[in-house]
A protein has these predicted regions:
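Conserved phosphate-binding loops in nucleotide/dinucleotide-binding enzymes
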Residues: 41-42, 46
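Short, low-complexity, polar/charged sequence segments that are solvent-exposed and flexible
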Residues: 49-52, 61-63, 94, 117-121
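Conserved polymerase palm-domain catalytic core
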Residues: 12, 16-20, 24-31, 35, ...
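Metal-dependent nuclease catalytic cores that hydrolyze phosphodiester bonds in DNA/RNA
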Residues: 2, 65, 97
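Exposed loop/turn and edge beta-strand positions of beta-sandwich/beta-sheet ligand-binding modules
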Residues: 38
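Charged boundary/loop elements
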Residues: 58-71
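Duplex nucleic acid-engaging cores and interfaces of nucleic-acid transaction enzymes
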Residues: 47-57, 89
Length: 194
């Protein structure tokens, strides 16, 4: 449907982003079963909102990615799980222990105020901060009954910009502390200290 009027739809996104009038529609709440029998909740944005998030993410990533720890591999351009495993192979010979930690429902608990404060700290323009706030606060709509759920924490797992915001949060909440205390790295929501 989006593609049938692609040029007009892209123009609307561009126009609204430039004028400050882009308001993200609710993200679709979708339950995905996990291998352990539990569920992961995804917040799936509309096609238009994914495009808008992608445009802002490209702008932000150029400025934020260079500040992230060299051993932070999750959701980073030019870095992968394979790169993290290579570092594990190199470092596992130097240490006799590994600590693995899984941050339960991490994307659901990211504090908005701390992400916005970090964006301000890095000199992100006010319009970027405005849109990041709107995306984090966008309601979630249940696909089962259409109920709208207000969100005061978290960033939708499934959003284009969410991994970058999560990495920024973890940069301050975890990576800088780890850098002072240990040599380590982070891979998505799983932490391994070597």
């Amino acid at each position: 449907m989006f593609d049938q009027q692609r040029d007009g739809n892209l123009y609307k996104i561009w126009n609204r982003l430039c004028s400050g009038t882009w308001f993200p529609p609710p993200v679709l709440k979708k339950r995905i079963p996990k291998s352990n029998g539990k569920e992961r909740i995804l917040g799936i944005p509309t096609v238009s909102d994914r495009i808008a998030q992608g445009a802002i993410k490209l702008f932000m990533e150029e400025k934020l990615d260079p500040i992230f720890h060299a051993d932070s591999y999750g959701y980073r351009p030019g870095k992968s799980a394979h790169d993290a495993l290579k570092q594990c192979a190199i470092r596992c010979w130097r240490y006799s222990w590994i600590l693995e930690v899984d941050i339960s429902a991490f994307f659901d608990h990211v504090r908005h105020d701390l992400v916005l404060k970090a964006l301000e700290h890095h000199g992100m323009p006010k319009w970027v901060i405005l849109y990041c706030r709107r995306w984090m606060e966008a309601p979630m709509q249940s696909c089962e009954n259409g109920e709208l759920i207000t969100r005061t924490r978290g960033t939708p797992q499934g959003g284009v910009i969410s991994p970058l915001l999560a990495n920024l949060f973890l940069h301050y909440a975890f990576d800088l502390w780890m850098e002072r205390e240990y040599r380590g790295y982070r891979l998505r929501g799983t932490l391994m200290i070597l």
